[in-house]
């Protein structure tokens, strides 16, 4: 379970500071600048306080993009595979390599629970690989970045204020499956991701939204350039 759940007004405020950068990449402008799976970033991107990398596939783990936003004060949180590849090769304060089930305090006021992220009936993301989703708590808000996953049994035990869920199908769950995941998790707001690049289209995000009408609030974020 995450560390806290909060009021809707606080969630709405946090959502105004959450920026979809395309695919599974997000930036959160909170008390720390946080990135999830940064990829194809513009050269003038803001520097990161914390970077979360879910797994080692190229569209989630971009060494060039990580280097672009890292400083000597940046903390990177990731799985064991990415941690091994970056050890000693990145200018940053620290690399924290986690496995599903780990809970840590990344820095003052920022906590993370590493959770499972895997496929049930596809070969792309085996459970035994230890790829990650993250439930991050910052400024009293819990945000779940699911990584590349299907709708998995563990999700019924996850809770968060904001859920970032893949919807494209092919490598991850479909929009309908993602809607079922959202119903299991019951976030205050759900945001579709993992579409519009490589696989998936705007229609997947719309199917996800329509499937959850009057059940879970869905925000389709505009991709920032």
Regions found by a protein language model. Name each.
Residues 39-87, 159-164:
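Active-site metal-binding motif and surrounding structural segment of the metallo-beta-lactamase
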Residues 6-46, 95-159, 173, 222-225:
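Core dinuclear metal-dependent hydrolase active-site scaffold
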Residues 135-188, 193-200:
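Metallo-beta-lactamase
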Residues 2-4:
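N-terminal signal peptide c-region/cleavage motif recognized by signal peptidases
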Residues 36, 52-53, 113-117, 165, ...:
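Redox-cofactor binding/interface segments in oxidoreductases and associated redox assembly factors
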Residues 18, 90-110, 179, 183-225:
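Binuclear metal-ion centers of metallo-dependent hydrolases, dominated by the metallo-beta-lactamase
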Residues 42-43, 57-61, 83-86, 102-105, ...:
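Active-site environment of divalent metal-dependent phosphoester hydrolases
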């Amino acid at each position: 379970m995450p560390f806290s759940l909060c009021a809707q007004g606080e969630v709405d405020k946090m959502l105004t500071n959450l920026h979809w950068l395309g695919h599974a990449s997000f930036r959160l402008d909170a008390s720390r600048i946080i990135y999830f799976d940064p990829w194809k970033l513009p050269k003038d991107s803001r520097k990161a306080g914390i970077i979360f990398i879910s797994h080692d596939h190229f569209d989630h783990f971009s060494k060039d993009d990580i280097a672009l936003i890292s400083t000597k004060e940046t903390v990177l949180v990731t799985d064991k595979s990415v941690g091994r590849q970056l050890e000693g090769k990145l200018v940053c304060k620290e690399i924290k390599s986690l496995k599903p089930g780990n809970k840590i305090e990344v820095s003052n006021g920022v906590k993370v629970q590493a959770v499972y992220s895997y496929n049930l009936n596809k070969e792309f993301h085996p459970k035994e690989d230890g790829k990650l989703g993250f439930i991050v708590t910052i400024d009293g808000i819990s945000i779940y970045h699911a990584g590349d996953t299907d709708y998995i049994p563990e999700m019924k035990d996850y809770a968060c204020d904001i859920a970032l869920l893949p919807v494209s199908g092919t490598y991850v769950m479909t929009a309908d499956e993602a809607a079922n995941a959202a119903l299991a998790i019951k976030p205050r707001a759900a945001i579709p991701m993992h579409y519009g690049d490589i696989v998936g289209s705007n229609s997947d995000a719309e199917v996800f939204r329509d499937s959850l009408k009057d059940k879970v609030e869905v925000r389709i974020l505009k991709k920032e350039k």
